[in-house]
């Protein structure tokens, strides 16, 4: 009887132990598929982020197509002295580059600050050709500005001819007038004493505050000049006689 009573107790204890074990094992078994699926979802999400990262960077940087940028750079180089397009030119560039007007405006705003200074120092029609030196670029800029300004020329008056200094006149020049020295005071007078086949003496008659007279030596042939002076004096005397005869018949 006692052995029969012990057997149900042992079976009960075994059943309880098995049930406890089943309870302990069942959560682990049920959680393992959920954990596996969560890990897979996380890994898929991470790979999706990695794959989507380059596209996101491209969108954020806003790179334009290389062909469109080349068209815009060529236009800027041709109009580098007026490097911002008008509305009509923007529409024309938009058709060529397949870009919007806002993209073209933003590109020119940035390019005028970053690309244009280097572009102004380039040489030739191709902006990729080598740089100029600073003096060459400055000389080219001056030539372009001088070409747009018309040259001013006109006949010089007799005053400008008379104001030339004596040392710059040619040897064969003949003049009986007094030639003022450039830069001299108004009170100074320049007199010239001419003799045939002799030295030319130039003396300044100045005021007390002016410097001492300066003499310059210049060899010249004034024989023909002397003949003209004599002829002019003779002609003047003849005219004076004719006037006197007419006044006193």
Curated annotation (Swiss-Prot):
Q: Where is the composition biased (Low complexity)?
A: 202-215
Q: Which key words tag this protein in UniProt?
A: DNA-binding, Homeobox, Nucleus, Transcription, Transcription regulation
- Give me the positions annotated for DNA binding: 55-118
Query: Compositional bias (Basic and acidic residues) at which positions?
Result: 1-27
Q: Which cysteine pairs make disulfide bonds?
A: none
Composition-biased stretches (Polar residues):
28-46, 159-172
The places in or outside the cell where this protein is found are: Nucleus
The UniProt entry's GO CC annotations, sorted and at most eight, read: nucleus
Tell me the GO BP annotations in alphabetical order. regulation of DNA-templated transcription
- Gene3D superfamilies registered for this protein in UniProt: Homeodomain-like
Disordered as annotated region, ranges: 1-60, 121-215
Q: Name the Pfam families on file.
A: Homeobox_KN
Alphabetized GO MF terms: DNA binding
Entry function: May have a transcription role in testis.
Q: Which family does it belong to?
A: Belongs to the TALE/TGIF homeobox family.
Q: What is this protein called?
A: Homeobox protein TGIF2LX
Q: Which organism is it from?
A: Miopithecus talapoin
The upper taxonomy is: Eukaryota, Metazoa, Chordata, Craniata, Vertebrata
Q: Which gene encodes it?
A: TGIF2LX
